[in-house]
Amino acid sequence: MRPLDTRLADALRSQLTLRAIFNGIPSPAIVEMCAFAGFDFVLIDNEHGSADLQTTEHMLRAARACGMPAAVRCLEHDLARTLDLGAGGVQVPMVNTAAHASRLVEQVKYPLPADASGVRGQRGSAFSTRAAGYGAFGGPEHTRASNAGVALIVMIETPEGIANAADIAAVDGVDAVFVGPNDLAHSMGHDNRWGDAPVQQAIERGLGAIAAAGKCAGILALTLDEEQRYAAWGARFFATVTTGLIMRAFKDAAQGGRAKLDY
C-alpha cells in the first residue's frame, strides 16, 4: 500500500455528501477513533492544534492504517513539508482572492513535463519523503499521482472572501472551498456569533456561489439544524470538531445523575 492516499480528491470532486472532523489534539489514537466512528475523512488541524511535524506524520499513518483519508489544515508556509509527509490534501485558511488561490495551486502541484497539459505548479520534488514511500514509489508516477490526487481546500473567512467566492472556486486546481463561520463572524464585527442574520446571509451567498461554480462547498456544522440549512444553501462537506464532541460527552458524564439526585 502506498503512503499517499488520493481518495479525498476524488470524493471532493464527486457529488457525495461528506462528513469530516477537525482534530487539533496531537494524538494518532484520536485519529483512529475518528476513523472507527465512521467519518469520511479527518482534518488534522495544524493551524490551531499543537502537533509538530513528526506527530502529524504519525497521525497520517494512523489514518492510512484505518483506511480513512486525511487532510491537514496548515498555514501557507508549512505546505511543502506537510505535503512531503504524505497528506492526501491540505486546507489553507484566510484565502481572499482568486490570485491567492492560484498561488496555492502552484505550491501544491509539481511542474509538468514540457509536452504535458494542465496546471503547472512549482512544488519542489523529493522522493526521499514518506509521500513517495522514501523512494519506493518515486519518479514520474509519484509526480503524476500527486498532481492528480492531492486535494486543495481553501478557506474563505472574511467579507472579501465571500465577495470573491465564485472567482476563488473557479480556479483550476481548487477542489473545495470551505466557509469558516467563526472568523467570518469576527471579521464582520459579530464576535463569534455566526448565527447572527448578517453572517448567515453572507454564508448563504458564499455557499451558493461555490456550488454554482461547480466546486464542493464546505462549512463547519455543529448541529443537525445547521447541516440541513447549509445543505439547502449548497454545502455538501460538513465538519465538526473533536474537542467540542469530547467536552460535551465529558460534561454529560460529569453531571451524571446530579440534577435528578440533587448531589
Annotate each predicted stretch with a short phrase:
Residues 32, 36, 72, 77-92, ...:
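Catalytic cores of alpha/beta
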Residues 1-70, 76, 106, 152, ...:
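Conserved N-terminal beta1-alpha1 strand-loop-helix module at the mouth
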Residues 19-23, 42-44, 70-73, 90-92, ...:
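Hydrophobic faces of well-ordered beta-strands that scaffold small-molecule active sites
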Residues 53-84, 106-114, 145-147, 195-218, ...:
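Alpha-helix-loop-beta-strand connector modules within alpha/beta enzyme cores
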Residues 89-104, 177-186, 235-253:
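Glycine-rich phosphate-binding active-site loops on the catalytic face of alpha/beta enzymes
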Residues 1-22, 134-148, 204-205, 209-212:
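N-terminal amphipathic alpha-helix/helix-capping segment at the start of soluble metabolic enzymes
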Residues 85, 89-172, 261:
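Conserved anion-binding
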Residues 21, 34, 45, 90, ...:
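Conserved, mostly hydrophobic/aromatic
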